[in-house]
């Protein structure tokens, strides 16, 4: 479990807390989405999770290890993998396979173990046929999948995606999200999704809204998505699917469920059409 206890963070040169008195527990295997407007503190919170930033007050514990303990940082950063918005900042080698192997080589693992992990990681993101390709020749979506493979090769227990799909087109964005959800199901990795896209956030088990460096709301996305006042107060909008479902109801179409994604809306409409 990742436990954040009374964490406050102030950036150097500032007097205004970027995060203030944050208390949060992230369970192994869960899918947590953290959203909020720009400047709300969500990316700062992401960087606390593996010790890239350390709280000015309070503490962050990863499976009982304190991120303030220098001797625990290497282990913590292996447990909590991070994928950022711009994949080019995480790609360092001449070929796809070498890039995935880079972090493993720094751990001093045997060559056979490195080869095994690289192969498994590339297969898990669908890049096994591109192992010898230079990273700069990949598309944006492929680069992000490569960055993800490099993190997965380290065998993390928690995977933090910090706006990792923000620079991708809708098709590539959906591919990345689907792969991450599949990995969670197959390997039990906890997913912490930092996003400003409500369409992504509502797919999580639990959603947390940040506002002005504090936790403004947390709970079930399905519960939140039909409370427009909470969303408006946080500077967020209804996801497109939920807005469409609302319009359909206002037009007299009685849906049996409250869909939060395209697949759920399609099923609800199919059931409605089948009854008629």
From Swiss-Prot:
The residues that the entry says bind ATP are: 36-43
Instruction: Tell me which InterPro entries the record gives.
Output: AAA+_ATPase (IPR003593), ABC_transporter-like_ATP-bd (IPR003439), ABC_transporter-like_CS (IPR017871), ABC_transpr_CbiO/EcfA_su (IPR015856), ECF_ABC_transporter_ATP-bd (IPR050095), EcfA_1 (IPR030947), P-loop_NTPase (IPR027417)
Organism encoding this protein: Moorella thermoacetica (strain ATCC 39073 / JCM 9320)
Similarity comment text for this entry: Belongs to the ABC transporter superfamily. Energy-coupling factor EcfA family.
The record's subcellular locations are:
Cell membrane
Lineage of producing organism: Bacteria, Bacillati, Bacillota, Clostridia, Moorellales
EC code:
7.-.-.-
What's the protein's topology in the membrane? Peripheral membrane protein
Q: Which GO terms describe its molecular function?
A: ATP binding; ATP hydrolysis activity; ATPase-coupled transmembrane transporter activity
* Function of the protein: ATP-binding (A) component of a common energy-coupling factor (ECF) ABC-transporter complex. Unlike classic ABC transporters this ECF transporter provides the energy necessary to transport a number of different substrates.
- ABC transporter domain location is 2-237
Name used for this protein in its record? Energy-coupling factor transporter ATP-binding protein EcfA
One Gene Ontology CC term in the entry = ATP-binding cassette (ABC) transporter complex
Gene3D superfamilies assigned to the protein according to its UniProt record, in alphabetical order = P-loop containing nucleotide triphosphate hydrolases
Whether Lipid biosynthesis counts among this entry's keywords is: no
Query: What keywords are annotated for this sequence in UniProt?
Result: ATP-binding, Cell membrane, Membrane, Nucleotide-binding, Translocase, Transport
Q: How does it assemble?
A: Forms a stable energy-coupling factor (ECF) transporter complex composed of 2 membrane-embedded substrate-binding proteins (S component), 2 ATP-binding proteins (A component) and 2 transmembrane proteins (T component).
| Keyword Nucleotide-binding set for record | yes
Q: Tell me which domain of life the UniProt entry assigns to the organism this sequence originates from.
A: Bacteria
């Amino acid at each position: 479990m990742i436990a954040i206890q009374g964490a406050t963070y102030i950036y150097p040169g500032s007097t205004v807390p970027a995060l203030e008195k944050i208390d949060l527990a992230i369970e192994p295997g869960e899918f947590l989405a953290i959203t909020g407007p720009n400047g709300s503190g969500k990316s700062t919170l992401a960087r606390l999770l593996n010790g890239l930033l350390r709280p000015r007050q309070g503490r962050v514990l990863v499976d009982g290890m304190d991120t303030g303990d220098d001797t625990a940082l290497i282990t913590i950063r292996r447990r909590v993998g991070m994928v950022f918005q711009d994949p080019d900042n995480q790609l360092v080698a001449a070929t796809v396979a070498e890039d995935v192997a880079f972090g493993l080589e720094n751990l001093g693992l045997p060559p056979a173990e490195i080869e095994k992990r690289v192969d498994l990681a590339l297969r898990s993101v669908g890049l096994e046929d591109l192992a010898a390709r230079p990273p700069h020749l990949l598309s944006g979506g492929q680069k992000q999948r490569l960055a993800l493979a490099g993190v997965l090769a380290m065998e993390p227990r928690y995977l933090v995606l910090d706006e990792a799909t923000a620079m991708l087109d809708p098709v590539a964005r959906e591919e990345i999200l689907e792969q991450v959800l599949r990995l969670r199901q197959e390997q039990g990795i906890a997913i912490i999704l930092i996003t400003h896209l409500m369409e992504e956030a509502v797919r999580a088990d639990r959603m947390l809204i940040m506002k002005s460096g504090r936790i403004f709301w947390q709970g079930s996305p399905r519960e939140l998505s039909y409370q427009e006042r909470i969303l408006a107060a946080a500077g967020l909008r209804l996801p497109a699917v939920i807005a469409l479902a609302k319009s359909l109801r206002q037009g007299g179409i009685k849906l049996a469920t409250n869909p939060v994604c395209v697949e759920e809306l399609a099923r609800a409409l199919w059931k409605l059409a089948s009854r008629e």
